[in-house]
Amino acid sequence: MLAIIPSLALATEFKTPAITPERVAALQGTPEAMLVVDVRGAGEYKSGHVPGAVNIPHTKLTERLDQLRQAKGVVLYCIIGDRTLLAEQTLLESGLGNVYHLDGGLMGWRKAGLEVRTGWGP
């Protein structure tokens, strides 16, 4: 139980603005669409992810900064927010702007009743 409490506490200290699952879903397929990044491991991504999301584990973000800089904006998510917080810190320290976090993470996406895809493709 103690291991969960610090993780949840971290998830509330985001430095980036939150964006709701409904807003992300509404922007998908439009010119205003942002790059949605699942920062979990590959196995977790395969078991369920936001449609259109790319999988870049938080430990690999610096290797993909060029791709991330080309996006209109970047929306980060994990299951509840702990790895999103680490990813956010990495991107902000790298000078990347227009970074957002998905409000509620993948759990929030599911709670909103939005589609979750499985497998490797976005």
Region annotations inferred by a language model:
Residues 2-35, 42-73, 82-122:
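Rhodanese-like catalytic fold shared by cysteine-dependent sulfurtransferases
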Residues 77-78:
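Metallo-beta-lactamase
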